[in-house]
């Protein structure tokens, strides 16, 4: 681990890594926790997996469609930061603008600064990454099916997040670009 110059390592914050499936969020998150002291990964997918076991919830194709998922993501992040402090790195795709607004405003109300980054890659690289992923091979078709949703969401995502192009960029370099963005935003009071 190394300290980021200019980042208050005592402050709490969230670094939210958005982007379509295959953009490099999880890999970048792992690199970021090596760069930033007191950083840990919080994966909101786990909240969704928990909710799948609750009887009576309506059937949905994506657990983000459950309002409790969005509220629990905010509450869990808030509780974690209250308990352990530091920085939460959140590698989570959110493609519905209303859902992002709910999560972001909830975190804002809790007094948690959010640094939102969109990891973007070109179409060929994206499809190659999805098709050659050996970790979650069962999710391959689901990820490919959601690429059009990502392209639809790009207009609002590009307004809401700082875009980092991951095409042909090694994960460690992407993580350094995100860390530099956090450092610049923190220094600028954003």
Where do the PLM segments sit?
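Conserved phosphate-donor/acceptor-positioning beta-strand/loop module used by diverse small-molecule
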Residues: 108-130
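Hydrophobic anchor at the beta1->P-loop junction of P-loop NTPases
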Residues: 17
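Conserved glycine(s) of the Walker
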Residues: 24
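Conserved substrate/cofactor phosphate-moiety recognition/catalytic segment
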Residues: 27-75
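Glycine-rich phosphate-binding loop used to anchor ATP phosphates in small-molecule kinases
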Residues: 65-116
């Amino acid at each position: 681990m190394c300290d980021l110059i200019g980042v208050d390592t005592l402050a709490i914050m969230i670094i939210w890594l958005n982007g379509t499936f295959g953009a490099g969020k999880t890999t970048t998150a792992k690199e970021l926790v090596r760069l930033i002291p007191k950083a840990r990964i919080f994966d909101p997918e786990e909240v969704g997996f928990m909710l799948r076991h609750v009887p009576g919830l309506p059937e949905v194709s994506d657990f983000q469609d459950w309002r409790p998922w969005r509220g629990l993501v905010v509450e869990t992040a808030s509780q974690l930061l209250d308990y352990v402090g530091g920085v939460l790195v959140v590698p989570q795709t959110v493609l519905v603008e209303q859902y992002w607004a709910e999560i972001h405003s909830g975190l804002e109300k809790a007094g948690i600064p959010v640094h939102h980054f969109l990891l973007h890659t070109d179409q060929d690289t994206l499809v190659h990454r999805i098709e050659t992923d050996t970790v979650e091979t069962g999710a391959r078709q689901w990820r490919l099916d959601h690429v059009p949703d990502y392209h639809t969401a790009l207009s609002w995502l590009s307004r809401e997040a700082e875009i980092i192009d991951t095409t042909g960029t090694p994960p460690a370099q992407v993580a350094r670009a995100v860390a530099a963005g956090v450092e610049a935003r923190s220094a600028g009071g954003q």
